């Protein structure tokens, strides 16, 4: 497997000097297939996420650190490359958001999407993480038959 890494500068907190955002960026710079299933993965997650983390995206709802660790192990298991580029962040008190672009390579797919992560912290750890992105553009539109159907539906709706 190729190295799957984020290439954005993990210290790029130009929109905010909040160290919690810096830690979030650093985490996604560190995660890779090489960290999946290792103690390092757990340690990295524990530096950013609360033990009672509630994590969601358009395809998953996860509660707790153990489930989050399994999610990341599965996520990085089949990819050969991943890159998160962080564009800007906003923080006020214990809530924040991060705008990002993700690109990845899977043995059968090469895709990416833009998204936003909504964050809520408790004791400086992320207790709620919600990713918002177009799941179709990330996955379904790249599958042969389903992708063609989605493309045709979008054409008709335009």
Task: Identify the residue ranges that each predicted region occupies.
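C-terminal and inter-domain tail/linker signature
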Residues: 2-158
């Amino acid at each position: 497997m190729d190295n799957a890494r984020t290439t954005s500068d993990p210290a790029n907190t130009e929109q905010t000097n909040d160290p919690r955002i810096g830690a979030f960026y650093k985490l996604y710079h560190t995660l890779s297939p090489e960290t999946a299933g290792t103690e390092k993965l757990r340690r990295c997650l524990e530096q950013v996420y609360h033990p009672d983390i509630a994590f969601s995206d358009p395809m998953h709802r996860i509660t707790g650190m153990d489930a989050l660790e399994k999610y990341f192990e599965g996520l990085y298991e089949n990819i050969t490359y991943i890159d998160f580029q962080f564009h800007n962040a906003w923080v006020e008190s214990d809530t924040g958001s991060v705008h990002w672009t993700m690109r990845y390579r899977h043995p059968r797919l090469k895709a990416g999407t833009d998204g936003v992560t909504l964050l809520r912290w408790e004791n400086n750890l992320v207790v709620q993480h919600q990713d918002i992105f177009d799941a179709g553009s990330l996955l379904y539109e790249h599958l042969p038959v389903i992708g063609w159907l989605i493309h045709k539906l979008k054409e008709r709706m335009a």
